[in-house]
Amino acid sequence: MSRQVFCRKYQKEMEGLDFAPFPGAKGQEFFENVSKQAWQEWLQHQTTLINEKRLNVFEPEAKKFLEEQREKFFNNDESVEKAEGWKPE
C-alpha cells in the first residue's frame, strides 16, 4: 500500500511522494505534506514557467521567483503566475 499524506494543495488524503524532492527541512516538509499528484502538477507548471519566461535556473533571481511561485502554487494562491497564452487542456 502506498504512503498517504494530507495534501496541502488538495486538502485531502492522497498518495504521498516516494522520497523528499530535495534535501533539507523544506524537502522534508514537502515529503510530509504534498501528494504525488500535486508535486507532478507543480513540476509541469514549473517547466512551463521556466520555458515561457526563459528563466536561467542557475541565477539567484530565477531560483527565488520559482520558490515564491511554488509556495503560491501549493497554497492555492490566486496570484500564482500563469504562462501567457497557455491554456490547460
From Swiss-Prot:
Domain of life: Bacteria
Pfam families: Iron_traffic
InterPro entries, A to Z: Fe_traffick_prot_YggX, Fe_traffick_prot_YggX_sf
Listed GO biological process terms: cellular response to oxidative stress
GO MF entry, a single one: iron ion binding
GO cellular component terms, semicolon-separated: cytosol
Keywords, ordered alphabetically: Iron
Family annotation (Gene3D superfamilies): Fe(II) trafficking protein YggX
Family that this chain belongs to: Belongs to the Fe(2+)-trafficking protein family.
Known function: Could be a mediator in iron transactions between iron acquisition and iron-requiring processes, such as synthesis and/or repair of Fe-S clusters in biosynthetic enzymes.
Descriptive protein name: Probable Fe(2+)-trafficking protein
Provenance organism: Acinetobacter baumannii (strain ATCC 17978 / DSM 105126 / CIP 53.77 / LMG 1025 / NCDC KC755 / 5377)
